[in-house]
A protein has these predicted regions:
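Predominantly soluble domains enriched in secretory-pathway, periplasmic, or organellar proteins
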Residues: 1-307
């Protein structure tokens, strides 16, 4: 199987320096949301027709984007104003905006408890400002916070262990935070490569896939604790997505501008697909096995089908 280029979607031009960041798909409405950080927007794409629909404005420094299909919610981390927003996915109506911490970025959600973990990058000039905040979405309040051992990157939630897993850039770790005790870390996994960055979960296979700035893809088995090197990457990565339909892992590498595709069962590299220099983020529409790479130099999205 391989990624076949279907075409490109024109997106709004950048209003200032920067480009795109995290993206996510709401599968019921076929809406694809991507943080357009340079515009303080989230751009909305119809993933069924591959058309740009509109932009959601006023999300200063939009960085993290996450969708809960279970609750039809859209979450954004607004790094430029230290807030998170909660919107109705599919309709894009803002329901809540809340202070979360300093420079929020990574997001993960427990749909059964309605708990949103926010990874706050922090400010080097402010001590203990790299934190993880836990927000009770139903109560609309922060219910816990923990100081992290370093700058956080992305995060995921695992239903079986009822825990959040969060990348720390330096020291290179993945930390575990139980949803029931959000003010403390339970466990730390030491990564064999520098700069854990992108993170995603294979819930059936029980593996976390961590893409590290040291150009390595690392897998952590959540049941056994085994840590293994999956393979070398084409360069320093950013976003990682796991596709459960095909058991493929997609890693966006901005320099030189490629997607590295791995087989999650055999733990091997399948192919490397050129995108565009600077294309460090992507999204996956699982129903159609589509992969979207966001191209900052030309403010477009490249659409691929994994087939």
């Amino acid at each position: 199987m391989s990624l076949r280029l279907l075409g490109h979607i024109e997106l709004p031009a950048h209003a200032k320096e920067g480009g795109f960041d995290h993206a996510a798909v709401h599968h019921e409405s076929s809406r694809l949301y991507v943080a357009h950080t340079s515009n303080d927007d989230v751009d909305v794409i119809d993933s069924a027709s591959d058309r740009f629909l509109r932009s959601i404005h006023g999300l200063k420094g939009a960085a993290g984007v996450l969708v809960s299909d279970e609750r039809s919610l859209l979450f954004t981390a607004n790094r430029g104003e230290n807030t998170i927003s909660i919107l109705s996915a599919g309709r894009e109506q803002e329901m809540l905006r809340l202070f979360s911490g300093i420079r929020p970025n990574g997001l993960a959600f427990d749909p059964s408890r309605g708990l949103l973990l926010v990874a706050n990058v922090g400010d080097p000039e402010i001590g203990n400002s790299s934190t993880a905040s836990m927000i009770d979405v139903d109560r609309k309040t922060v219910i816990g916070s923990v100081v992290l051992p370093g700058r956080p990157r992305w995060a995921v939630y695992d239903e079986r262990t009822t825990a959040f897993y969060l990348n720390i850039a330096d020291p290179p770790l993945i930390v575990k935070i139980d949803a029931k005790t959000p003010s403390k870390m339970l466990e730390r996994y030491k990564m064999p490569a520098k700069g854990p960055h992108g993170l995603d979960l294979d819930p059936r296979g029980r593996y976390l896939f961590c893409a590290c700035d040291g150009a390595k893809l690392v897998a952590v088995h959540l049941d056994s604790g085994e840590i293994r090197l999956v393979g070398e990457l084409s360069g320093p990565p950013d976003v990682v997505f796991f596709n459960p339909n095909l058991s493929h892992v997609y890693v966006a590498v901005g320099t030189p501008g490629v997607i590295d595709v791995f087989d999650a069962r055999r733990m091997k590299l399948l192919e490397t697909v050129p995108t565009e220099k600077g294309a460090h983020t992507l999204a996956v529409a699982q129903r159609e096995n589509k992969v979207y790479a966001f191209l900052p130099a030309t403010h477009r999205a490249a659409t691929y089908r994994d087939e």
